[in-house]
Amino acid sequence: MTSENHTTIKADSALVMSPTGSTSQAAPFSPSTSKPIQELPDELIQAGWSKCWSKRENRPYYFNRFTNQSLWEMPVLGQHDVISDPLGLNAAPASGEANADAGLGNGQRKRHPSEDASQAGPNSFKRPKVEIPATPTTPTVPISPSTPGVKPWVNTTTDEKQGQASTPAPAPYRPSVVYWDLDIQTNAVIRERAPADHLPPHPEIELQRAQLTTKLRQHYHELCSQREGIEPPRESFNRWLLERKVVDKGLDPLLPSECDPVISPSMFREIMNDIPIRLSRIKYKEEARKLLFKYAEAAKKMIDSRNATPESRKVVKWNVEDTMNWLRRDHSASKEDYMDRLEHLRKQCGPHVASVAKDSVEGICSKIYHISAEYVRRIRQAHLTLLKECNISVDGTESAEVQDRLVYCYPVRLSIPAPPQTRVELHFENDIACLRFKGEMVKVSRGHFNKLELLYRYSCIDDPRFEKFLSRVWCLIKRYQVMFGSGVNEGSGLQGSLPVPVFEALNKQFGVTFECFASPLNCYFKQFCSAFPDIDGFFGSRGPFLSFSPASGSFEANPPFCEELMDAMVTHFEDLLGRSSEPLSFIIFVPEWRDPPTPALTRMEASRFRRHQMTVPAFEHEYRSGSQHICKREEIYYKAIHGTAVIFLQNNAGFAKWEPTTERIQELLAAYKVSGRSLPSPGPSSTNTGEKDSKPAPERTAPSQDNSSPVDKTAQDTTNT
């Protein structure tokens, strides 16, 4: 039980806010803390038991500080220790009935095998049934913690359990390093909203989506190779997915299908930047000479093989010939001379080369989009068929009544009930949890698997017995794996996040409790926005940030480094700040790109809501890798090779409440100086368990007037330097 405060006084407050629109007058209602607390017998106190009061449930519960066990009913004297004596062989029951129920948690009725067989699904976590009302005002936190010693992720049948009865239950897994703090409650307030109409996730559909997305990546690779003779720009497909989702009105959570315009500016720009060849970073003089020669040769070949105007052919051929002559006669040139000559050649030939490649590149973008739309149609049809076979109607779903009131933010709820889930197998390989469905395996560290279990217990309201937990974890990991690709370190920058000490400083100094761009895998707080509401909502997501409209709260934003997404983010910030009179604050972390500056950075610097701005120098701070849920511990932190601009956007009330004073800024900068790789155990020390804001890729989509690759501008940020 890692997120409960075991005290007779401290507890959680209710979620309901007064609909008056004022957070100062709308303090959440909470029951009195002056409830008389019944004294426990000395025997129970000596055994580690104490009686605590739950404000959430408005009733007492009992907590054992030695075993971390929590019970609603008073512990029975002589009850056995479920950890040291899981079978109750040494117990001293008070009655025959108690003896018959030995091995069960206190207050739990022994279940018959027939009941277990009928109620336990293929992905069942054997947990005591917990009733959680599905109202948005109910705190999305577990009513009762799991019983120590019980491993809910063990998928076994009743017969298997009986055959293994002689094996003691293993001790609960406790990660040695924690990169999150799930105890922090939100201060983000929103208007109550109806459940979303997304189709509920299912492993069969997720597997089909993964296969078609991989096939789409292959189509993209083939088109770039066949039509332009280049490799697809690194991460360009990933940024295409991000950019398309800014404008997409389609129904699939991952693939775009209804976008205007059809031609993606992001994909078009990145392919054009690698034509006629991809320019790489140069360290030595000979490399610069070879690169200049290759560029001149490729430009001449392209202009000869395409339908170019006579003027374009003349300009390109003359400049290429002039460059070749210079290379033949000048053997004493330095690296800088070669690079200057290359820049001159690009300025002269670039516009003509781009004009002959324009139609072909637009054709690539258009074809990829239309293939994606066809794949979306197939996936949707298969999903609807599956739901129909389970007698689940999509069109007949009644919309829930929503009151016009302010509430603390709560996870996305789905209006369509989930179908029965197919079996997902789980096993552990050292510190790695491996989940397999139809031969497709996904992996996650045991620490992050434990974190997903906690998030699921806090957020999910339709699966109190954890019967769908494993299948939803498989879908979640598979979705992010497919979105960011299977290459080495591919997409990890798009999922990176701030160091733990920085999150701690943001929370302590500026009241930050919410991440605008994160995922269940890399979030620090248990409340965050993410890309996929249909699956992430079960793990605490409040949905995509561009459709999330808080009335008040303090937020951290570290968006994926996609220019179109960052620009849309700034528009959303200014709209929210302009509409709300309640305290509202956004602290934004974006790359310090000045050659040229990104539109998002320029707009934020000129915003009327900008209260403060600072820069953290390159190589003097770190990020956490987006693959932190699976990579080695020593690879989690990496140095940033670019500066990071930190901008405070606040309305008047937010500035008054969370003003970026000199002292607070100094504390934030000091947190950046703490190396994550030197921390013995990052994260809150008070918890035993517990990853974007989505820290996007330390890569930038290069502007159209620059023919260098995005990778060349920023290199690979996932290596420790």
From Swiss-Prot:
Domain of life: Eukaryota
Biased segments, Polar residues type: 1-10, 19-36, 702-721
Cross-referenced SUPFAM superfamilies: WW domain
Region (Disordered): 1-37, 93-170, 675-721
Gene Ontology molecular function terms on file: mRNA (2'-O-methyladenosine-N6-)-methyltransferase activity; RNA polymerase II C-terminal domain binding; S-adenosyl-L-methionine binding
Outcome reported for the amino acid change (mutating W593A): Abolished methyltransferase activity
Impact when changing E563A: Strongly reduced methyltransferase activity
Biological processes annotated in GO: methylation; mRNA processing; positive regulation of translation
Residues that bind substrate: R239, R269, E563, W593, R594, D595, P596, P597
Effect of substituting F561A: Strongly reduced methyltransferase activity
UniProt function note: Cap-specific adenosine methyltransferase that catalyzes formation of N(6),2'-O-dimethyladenosine cap (m6A(m)) by methylating the adenosine at the second transcribed position of capped mRNAs.
Family: Belongs to the CAPAM family.
Protein name: mRNA (2'-O-methyladenosine-N(6)-)-methyltransferase
Phylogenetic classification of the source organism: Eukaryota, Metazoa, Chordata, Craniata, Vertebrata
Gene that encodes it: pcif1
